[in-house]
């Protein structure tokens, strides 16, 4: 009888232990309502096959007054037009792969080089407001391309400070009427020259004015002064009943979409490939050509 009672106690203890929360955080904002749930995969084992197209790149430009803004256009044919806005790093051998990979999913991606036309070195600390106009004009330029056809709206994809350029282009420069969605990787959702307390505890007021669907990606180990404004901004948009979503990828930090091979991790690649597939589906569901 004692042996039996001891066995019962041991089983009860093991069950209770199994129910304990793990020591590491495994639940993130996207797990609250599980909007990402895929019943087709869970119940029938089906995984969506991503589109894969050979991409060609060509150069072009558009003007803002006397300044010519160079553009790289990544295209695999007559596909819907999307705009990509780079961040502080500019467009280089690593970051240009981001719009290229998006184009391979079946889009024509317009990637303006906002820095070189204005002789701005990469990694600028200060924010030049004229770049907001240049970013807004990229949307106009994209929708005027032959590939756009009768497409009335585009989606704007960005990363890091490009997320701020996109925010200002849509809200301050009035391009929301031409925009079907805002997608950004760890965007800088605050004026780059705002005081430290505002960088950490507040998001830019323009975030509350976003009316288009929003999708944001960031890593678990992103810098805190980016994480807090992003999550607060998403919460505010959701409270206003706007379509706003965020995914926090476990085990990665900033730059997971373009970190070079010598420092790249498997977690970086998993996050980059998953976010790319989700961004492509998000765009495809919102823009019509």
Predicted features along the sequence, with ranges:
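The feature captures the conserved acid-bearing segment of alpha/beta-hydrolase catalytic domains
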Residues: 189-245
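C-terminal catalytic histidine-bearing segment of alpha/beta-hydrolase fold enzymes
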Residues: 243-289
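The serine-hydrolase catalytic nucleophile loop
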Residues: 90-99, 228-229
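Conserved alpha/beta-hydrolase
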Residues: 103-119
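Short beta-strand element of the alpha/beta-hydrolase
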Residues: 79-87
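N-terminal cap/lid segment of alpha/beta-hydrolase-fold proteins
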Residues: 23-76
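Alpha/beta-hydrolase active-site loop
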Residues: 126-146
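Alpha/beta-hydrolase fold nucleophile elbow
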Residues: 148-160
């Amino acid at each position: 009888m004692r042996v039996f009672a001891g066995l019962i106690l041991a089983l009860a203890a093991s069950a209770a232990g199994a129910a304990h929360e793990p020591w590491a955080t495994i639940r993130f904002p996207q797990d609250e309502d599980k909007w990402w749930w895929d019943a087709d995969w869970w119940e029938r084992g089906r995984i969506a096959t991503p589109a894969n197209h050979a991409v060609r790149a060509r150069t072009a430009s558009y003007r803002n007054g006397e300044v010519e803004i160079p553009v790289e256009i990544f295209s695999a044919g007559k596909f819907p037009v999307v705009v990509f806005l780079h961040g502080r790093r500019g467009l280089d051998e690593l970051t240009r792969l981001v719009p290229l990979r998006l184009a391979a999913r079946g889009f024509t991606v317009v990637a303006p080089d906002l820095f070189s036309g204005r002789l701005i070195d990469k990694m600028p600390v200060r924010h030049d407001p004229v770049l907001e106009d240049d970013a807004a004009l990229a949307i106009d330029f994209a929708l005027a391309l032959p590939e756009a056809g009768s497409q009335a709206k585009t989606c704007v994809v960005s990363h890091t400070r490009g997320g701020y350029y996109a925010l200002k282009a849509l809200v301050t420069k009035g391009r929301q009427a031409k925009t079907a969605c805002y997608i950004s990787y760890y965007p800088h959702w605050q004026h780059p020259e705002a005081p430290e307390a505002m960088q950490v505890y507040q998001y830019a007021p323009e975030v509350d004015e976003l009316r288009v669907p929003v999708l944001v990606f960031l890593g678990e180990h992103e810098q805190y002064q980016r994480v807090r404004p992003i999550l607060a901004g998403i919460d505010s948009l959701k409270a206003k009943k706007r379509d706003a979503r965020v995914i926090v990828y476990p085990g990665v930090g900033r730059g997971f979409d373009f970190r070079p091979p010598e420092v790249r991790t498997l977690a970086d690649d998993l996050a980059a490939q998953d976010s790319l597939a989700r961004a492509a589906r998000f765009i495809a569901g919102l823009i019509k050509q």
